[in-house]
């Protein structure tokens, strides 16, 4: 999905290079993911550094000597900061953006501590893992993800990253929401492929969806007569096209499995009402394909 999204955003998509594009775009998207997660780690480290330096001042105030530690002790931020697997991945990819460009760490931290949102959290006596996790998620969605200066920096650093940013930010929010007190370090790190078979499937799905894009575009157009095509979310179209590809060109995948999979993806990555729209279009097309005998599924019970 991510590779097709990036391919769709490209001004000059070259379908002769889709496989190479898949590998490159997947790697670049993962590097962006690591970079953004590392930003949370560095903001947390910056807060700890400020507290430590304040406590060491010759004329430290009472609040500096005994600071409110709620932010630096936030268990989700602590888990991210102590995540050795994350650090290995960053080192492997040679990513150290925020040590070189610390101004964005300072910028986001200063915006946070100046907010009522931060003040309310620090003053709250509520202390449980869910509350702390929700705070980190809200901080990310309200301060980090929409920050224009950060967006400009990422665009300048690597132009293709801004095309991937919506999907990456959404994935980070979903991953943060899965963190629990005893979660393994891998929870925050999405696995690109389960195994070699999964990698091959991703490659085949990309190639077949991209090469038949015009056919699937026409199918969507013909089955959404009351919709302004420009107002249909790009991700919704991509998800529908991928589902159509599975319907028509992957004979071993049951129709219900495909529908359920893409409804879940639409709930996770697209707009709030996307799953209703995607379900409606897919339902109409499945009925049409059954009537036209185009669902050539191999194996007993696979169509249903």
Locate predicted features.
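Class I Rossmann-like S-adenosyl-L-methionine
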Residues: 1-304
């Amino acid at each position: 999905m991510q590779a097709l999204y990036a391919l769709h955003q490209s001004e000059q998509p070259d379908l002769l290079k889709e496989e190479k594009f898949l590998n490159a775009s997947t790697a670049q998207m993962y590097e962006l993911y690591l970079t953004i997660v590392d930003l949370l780690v560095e903001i947390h480290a910056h807060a700890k550094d400020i507290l430590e330096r304040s406590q060491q001042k010759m004329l430290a105030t009472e609040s500096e000597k005994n600071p409110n530690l709620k932010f630096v002790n936030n268990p989700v931020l602590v888990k991210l900061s102590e995540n050795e697997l994350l650090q290995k991945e960053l080192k492997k990819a040679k990513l150290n953006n925020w040590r070189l460009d610390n101004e964005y760490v300072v910028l986001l931290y200063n915006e946070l501590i100046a907010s009522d949102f931060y003040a309310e959290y620090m003053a709250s006596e509520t202390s449980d893992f869910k509350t702390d996790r929700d705070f980190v998620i809200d901080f990310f969605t309200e301060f980090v993800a929409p920050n224009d200066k950060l967006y400009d920096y990422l665009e300048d650093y690597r132009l293709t990253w801004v095309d991937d940013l919506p999907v990456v930010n959404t994935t980070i929010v979903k991953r943060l929401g899965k963190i629990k007190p005893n979660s393994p370090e891998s929870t925050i790190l999405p696995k690109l492929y389960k195994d070699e078979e999964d990698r091959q499937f991703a490659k085949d799905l990309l190639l077949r969806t991209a090469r038949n894009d015009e056919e699937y575009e026409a199918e969507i157009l013909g089955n959404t007569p009351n919709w302004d095509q420009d107002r249909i979310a790009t991700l919704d179209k991509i998800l529908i096209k991928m589902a159509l590809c599975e319907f028509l060109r992957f004979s071993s995948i049951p129709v219900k499995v495909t529908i359920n999979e893409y409804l879940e993806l639409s709930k996770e990555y697209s707009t709030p009402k996307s799953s209703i729209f995607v379900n409606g279009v897919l339902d109409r097309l499945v009925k049409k394909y059954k009537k036209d005998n185009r669902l050539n599924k191999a194996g007993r019970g696979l169509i249903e």
